[in-house]
Swiss-Prot record:
The lineage of its organism: Bacteria, Pseudomonadati, Pseudomonadota, Gammaproteobacteria, Alteromonadales. Residues 1-26 form the signal peptide. The gene is katG. It catalyses: H2O2 + AH2 = A + 2 H2O; 2 H2O2 = O2 + 2 H2O. One of its GO terms (cellular component) is cytosol. This is Catalase-peroxidase. Homodimer or homotetramer. One of its GO terms (molecular function) is metal ion binding. Gene3D superfamilies: 1.10.520.10, Peroxidase, domain 2 (1.10.420.10). One of its GO terms (biological process) is hydrogen peroxide catabolic process. Binds 1 heme b (iron(II)-protoporphyrin IX) group per dimer. Heme b binds at H285. There is a cross-link at Y244-M270 (Tryptophyl-tyrosyl-methioninium (Tyr-Met) (with W-122)).
Length: 766
């Protein structure tokens, strides 16, 4: 779905909201104002995609995004090297100076931009979701639509403009992705909070990610509940255009307990438990304020994506009063949570738990809460008007922490122990802002916490010498002599390496977690096959390591990859093509204690077309769409996806040993029969009673020759895929096919080897 196609809407009863605010975390977003340009219409002379005419046609564009040709820095740019030239202390000093240097065109609340930048950081990182790893701060995606124009990101375009002089000063050495996270972290430190550190390494993207943000076609709509009211997979937010939930309550209903349910779901889907959730909400709402001085529909013009050229990328032009300062309109909610909005205190928890609250409405008409004790209504200084006093406020979502029994226990504990509260928030903030960065080895800078967190999927450093190419060659021979079959070795190597997700850089072959729970028991991985291969390879590992006297060892992770390479070399040779499959050793083995079973369970494939595996109950898209999704997560191009699937079919790598798509009489050899057969006009395909299976019959005799699934037949049906398939079906394509397969296979085996790449950016590996 093209999220840039917004339908024109007026202000609805729902004033768009999530869990923070301009001043804090996530609350300052707005309803789509009258006059917004995002209409979802096609402009004159605009070319129409094939999906416009045939919506069910497979969209391959995710496999063509983030091309290096979009990168003005060039494919050889080394961000890690550029970042190393930074004086990070000087960058922080520059940010600190900016924080208290208020600009007339966008004055700082309470004289400090810290809360504003905290919200920027939160919303940059807060789109991350665990189910598919998409979203997050890596890439600096908030610079681009649709995120740039989401209602929840209202006025954050100004935050980035405030930071532009710093970005301009440091140029390519400081990415927008890093700067947006660093600004909020420094903002906290400026206001007296002791953070847990900061790591650079977020390489900038140069175009928006293609992400499914929900089924809705209007901003702030919510049509994403499945059976039993569960939030549709893989989404994390409850409304289109929001980071998390509606702070006024579920679909605008001021129900704190209902809000608690939504909060628990949304935060769990961004990898946060109850304690982290309370720490983040309470800690974030300690700072700053929300903005609803006027009704958005009466004041605001179009979001950035719909604004005129003269606005130069800025949106939400405010035509009421000053247009900023005390007239600022963002979410429609208005006010600060604490009496000291630019200081780290426990006042948020004191206010929340200690006061009784009554429902009211902001000047914009949004539902919010103020203390029943009216003597408190003059306890909060105004952000801009000297001498004016206001009441502290809470949202319905804030009150969820008071009324939900589990959240309240945590909040009371934090209030009683400020040190525990501070530590919990510091760790949760670091996790929030670094969760999508992948392994710790990608981190840059001198402010990285020494502590290893289990959510970083730690892999130990080798305390031994790495094996040589000569050792690899010998081990290949030993593995082939071990009695393990080509299919067993290929399946296990693929199962381990293909767990990689480019979206959040989790999974992969390193760590040999295929030999640990939960991965060993995943249905798609054929647990019995994995156990047999792992057991045999461990025998070889023990034998090899016991014979070495030079402190040289081989890891199980390397052995699994070596085994797959050996199997492919044999399969290619059996097909008449001699080839060497490269292996770069250096992987190490994680332990079960270093593996968060619940967290890793989210990586379990619900579909893997390369193994002809599809779980209809768990998958949220069609088999062919899941094929593209899987290929996208593996950073494959269209040709790489094509050659890998065809080769794996000939190798007999299907889960469960099914024959669907195995269009060859020479199973276990690396041949191009899949493509030759699929394009053979002597074979006619027809549906069966099982909608997921097709039969290929001899066009002359009617004899059933093969069976296939949608992910097999799409390579002959889709015109783009057929064009590529033809190349591999040529009479002289045997060698090209094998060489291309080996290249694509090796790419998958090394996707998580960031030590072998300088760009740090998996997205640009295409």
């Amino acid at each position: 779905m093209n999220m840039n196609r917004f339908r024109k809407t007026t202000l609805s009863a729902l004033v768009a909201l999530s869990l923070g605010a301009t001043g804090a975390i996530a609350n300052d977003q707005i309803s789509k104002p009258a006059g917004a340009k995002g209409t979802g219409m096609t402009k004159a002379f605009q070319p129409k995609s094939n999906q416009f005419w045939w919506p069910d046609q497979l969209d391959l564009s995710p496999l063509r995004d983030h091309d290096n040709r979009s990168n003005p820095l060039g494919e050889d740019f080394d961000y890690a090297k550029a970042f190393s030239k930074l004086d990070l202390d000087q960058v922080k000093s520059d940010i600190n100076e900016l924080l208290t240097t208020s600009q007339d065109w966008w004055p700082a609340d309470f004289g400090n931009y810290g809360p504003f930048f905290i919200r920027l950081s939160w919303h940059s990182a807060g789109t991350y979701r665990t189910l598919d790893g998409r979203g997050g701060g890596d890439g600096g995606q908030m610079r681009f639509d649709p995120l740039n124009s989401w209602p929840d990101n209202g006025n954050l375009d100004k935050a980035r403009r405030l930071l532009w002089p710093i970005k301009q000063k440091y140029g390519e050495s400081l990415s927008w992705g890093d700067l947006m996270i660093l600004a909020g972290t420094v903002g906290m430190e400026n206001m007296g909070f002791d953070t847990y550190g900061f790591a650079g390494g977020r390489t900038d993207d140069w175009e928006p990610d293609m992400v499914y943000w929900g089924p809705e076609v209007e901003m702030l709509a919510s049509d994403r509940e499945e059976r039993e009211g569960k939030l549709q997979r893989p989404l994390g937010a409850t409304h289109m255009g929001l980071i998390y939930v509606n702070p006024e309550g579920p679909k605008g209903v001021p129900d704190p307990m209902g809000s608690a349910k939504n909060i628990r779901t949304a935060f769990a889907r961004m990898a946060m438990n109850d304690e982290e959730t309370v720490a983040l909400i309470a800690g974030g709402h300690t700072f700053g304020k929300m903005h609803g001085a006027h009704k958005p529909a009466d004041c605001l013009e179009a979001e950035p994506g719909g604004a005129g050229l003269e606005e130069q990328g800025l949106g939400w032009k405010n035509n009421c009063g000053k247009g900023n300062a005390e007239d600022t309109v963002t979410s429609g909610l208005e006010g600060a949570w604490t009496q000291l909005p630019t200081k780290w205190t426990s006042l948020y928890l004191q206010n929340l738990l200690g006061f009784e609250w009554k429902q009211t409405r902001s000047p914009a008409g949004a539902i919010q809460w103020v203390p029943t004790d009216e003597s408190l209504h003059t306890s909060v200084p105004d952000a801009h008007v000297e001498g004016k006093k206001n009441p502290p406020v809470m949202t319905t979502a804030d009150l969820a922490l008071k009324y939900d029994p589990e959240y309240r226990k945590i909040a009371e504990r934090f209030l009683a122990d400020p040190k525990e509260y501070q530590t919990a928030f510091a760790k949760a903030w670091f996790k929030l802002t670094h969760r999508d960065m992948g392994p710790k080895e990608r981190y840059l800078g001198n402010d990285i916490p020494r502590e290893n967190f289990i959510w970083q999927d730690p892999v130990p450093k080798a305390d031994y010498k790495t094996i040589s190419d000569k050792d690899v060659k010998k081990l290949k021979a030993d593995i082939l002599d071990s009695g393990l079959t080509v299919q067993q070795l290929v399946k296990t190597a693929w199962a381990g390496a293909s767990s990689f997700r480019a979206s959040d850089l989790r999974g992969g072959a390193n760590g040999a977690r295929i030999a640990l729970e939960p991965q060993m028991s995943w249905e798609a991985n054929e647990p019995e096959t994995v156990k047999a291969v792992v057991a045999k390879l461990k025998e070889l590992q023990e034998d090899y390591n016991s014979r070495m006297f030079s402190k040289k060892k081989v890891s199980l992770a390397d052995l699994i990859v070596i085994g797959g390479a050996a199997a492919i070399e044999k399969a290619a040779a059996d097909a008449g093509v001699e080839v060497s499959v490269p292996v770069v050793p250096g992987r190490t083995d994680a332990t079960q204690e270093q593996t968060d079973v619940n967290s890793f369970s989210l990586l379990e494939p619900t579909a893997d077309a390369f193994r002809n595996y599809y779980n209809a109950e768990a998958s949220y898209r069609s088999p062919t769409d899941m094929l593209v999704d899987k290929a996208d997560q593996l950073n494959l191009t269209v040709p790489e996806m094509t050659v890998l699937l065809g080769g794996l079919r000939s190798l007999g790598a299907n889960t469960g040993g099914t024959n669907h798509g195995v269009f060859t009489d020479n199973v276990g050899t690396l041949n191009n029969d899949f493509f030759v057969t699929l394009l053979d006009m002597g074979v006619k395909w027809r549906k069966t009673d099982d909608a997921s299976v097709y039969e290929g019959v001899n066009r002359s005799t009617g004899e059933v020759m093969y069976t296939g699934t949608p992910v097999d037949l799409v390579f002959g049906s889709n015109s783009e895929l057929r064009a590529v398939a033809e190349v591999y079906a040529y009479d002289n394509a045997k060698t090209r096919f094998v060489e291309d397969f080996v290249d694509a296979w090796t790419k998958v085996m090394t996707l998580d080897r960031f030590d072998l790449r300088h760009d740090l950016n998996a997205k640009l590996a295409k």
